[in-house]
Amino acid sequence: MLYPLVKKYLFSLDAEDAHEKVCKILRTLSKSSFLCSLIHSQWGYKNPKLENEILGLNFPNPLGLAAGFDKNASMLRALIAFGFGYLEAGTLTNEAQVGNERPRLFRHIEEESLQNAMGFNNYGAVLGARSFNRFAPYKTPIGINLGKNKHIEQAHALEDYKAVLNQCLNIGDYYTFNLSSPNTPNLRDLQNKAFVNELFCMAKEMTHKPLFLKIAPDLEIDDMLEIVNSAIEAGAHGIIATNTTIDKSLVFAPKEMGGLSGKCLTKKSREVFKELAKAFFNKSVLVSVGGISDAKEAYERIKMGASLLQIYSAFIYNGPNLCQNILKDLVKLLQKDGFLSVKEAIGADLR
C-alpha cells in the first residue's frame, strides 16, 4: 500500500496545504465516473448486513465522513468511492467567507489528532449548491452542514440560518445545523433551548427533509440534554454528537485556537454520547462522531445507540483503506455476537 509514503510526504507539509493538495486531486477524480469506479473497486466495501433505511434514506453502511472535509461539496463523487455510506458536505454559510487567519489547521501526531481553527471558510451557499449539482444525483445520502456567517450579529442569527437553508433547499438529503463550532465567535452561545426551539420550528416549516442538530462535547450534561430535548420537541429528527472539543488538556502541546478532534476526543465523545443515548435512544436518530478510528470503537458506539457514525481525523491518519478495514471488521464483530445485521445491533447495550 502506497499510503505510508504519501502520508510521509503530506505530513511534511503544512496541514492545510496538504489538505488542499488532496482536495485538488479529489476534485479532479470526481470529474471521471470511470476513475471513481476504479477507486471503489479497490477501496469500497459492500455487505447487505450493513445496509439500513433511516428516515426514508437508504444507507449502504453506517460510516459517514463528517462535515469539514468537503466544505464546498466539490468532491463528493470521489469521496463516496472510498466506501463511505454517506457524506456530510459543508459547513456552508449564506455568504462566502475566508475564515480565520492561517495557520489554522494543526496536527498532533502522537495523539493522532487534529486541531482546527478554520472558521467556516467556504464559497457560500449559492456556489456550494452549484458545485453539489454538478454531479448529482449521488449513490449515497448526502447531508448539508449549515453555519452562521461570522459578521452576523447574534440577534440576526435565526435569519441567517433561514437564509442559508433557503439557498440549500434543492440540494442534499438532510440538513445539519452547526451551532457547536468553537471557531466562530459566540456561536456556541446559540446552544440554548430558546434559540434551538426557534431554529427547528422555522426549519420544519421550510423543508420536509430530515433535520439534525450537531452539539459540542463541552456542554454540561444536563444543559446538553435540555437543549437536545428542545430540538427534538421543535422538530429535529436527529442529533449528531459531537463536534470538536476546546478541552486543551487532551493533547500535550495544544495551540491557542481551535477545536480538537481525533483519538484525543474518543473518551470524551463516547461519554457524552452515552448520556445522550440513555435519554434519547428510540426518540431520535443518534449519530456518533469523535475519535472513531477502528471497528471496535465503531461497534461500541452502535451498541450504545448510534444508528450512524462519522469519522474525519482517522481518515487523515489512516488513509483510503480505512472505511474498508472498519466495515470488514465490523461485519466480523456483528457475526461474532450473532447479529444478522447492523440494524439489530443498534442500542443493544440499552436493551
From Swiss-Prot:
Keyword Cell membrane part of the UniProt annotation: yes
Membrane topology recorded in Swiss-Prot or TrEMBL: Peripheral membrane protein
Residues binding FMN, per UniProt: A67, G68, F69, D70, K71, T91, N145, N178, K214, T242, G262, G291, Y312, S313
Binding-site positions, substrate: K71, N116, A117, M118, G119, F120, N178, N183, N243, T244
Active site per the UniProt annotation: S181 (nucleophile)
Entry's Gene Ontology BP terms: 'de novo' pyrimidine nucleobase biosynthetic process; 'de novo' UMP biosynthetic process
Pfam family of the protein (one): DHO_dh
Cellular compartments annotated: Cell membrane
Statement: the UniProt record of this protein carries the keyword Repressor: no
Source organism (scientific name): Helicobacter pylori (strain G27)
Top-level division of the source organism's lineage: Bacteria
Keywords: Cell membrane, Flavoprotein, FMN, Membrane, Oxidoreductase, Pyrimidine biosynthesis
PANTHER family: DIHYDROOROTATE DEHYDROGENASE (QUINONE), MITOCHONDRIAL (PTHR48109:SF4), DIHYDROOROTATE DEHYDROGENASE (QUINONE), MITOCHONDRIAL-RELATED (PTHR48109)
InterPro entries reported for this sequence: Aldolase_TIM (IPR013785), DHO_dehydrogenase (IPR050074), Dihydroorotate_DH_1_2 (IPR012135), Dihydroorotate_DH_2 (IPR005719), Dihydroorotate_DH_cat (IPR005720), Dihydroorotate_DH_CS (IPR001295)
Name listed for the protein in its UniProt record: Dihydroorotate dehydrogenase (quinone)
Cofactor(s) needed by this chain: FMN
Pathway assigned in UniProt: Pyrimidine metabolism; UMP biosynthesis via de novo pathway; orotate from (S)-dihydroorotate (quinone route): step 1/1
A Gene Ontology term for the protein's cellular component: plasma membrane
Family as reported in the entry's similarity comment: Belongs to the dihydroorotate dehydrogenase family. Type 2 subfamily.
UniProt subunit comment: Monomer.
Note accompanying the cofactor annotation: Binds 1 FMN per subunit.
EC number(s) on file: 1.3.5.2
Record's function text: Catalyzes the conversion of dihydroorotate to orotate with quinone as electron acceptor.
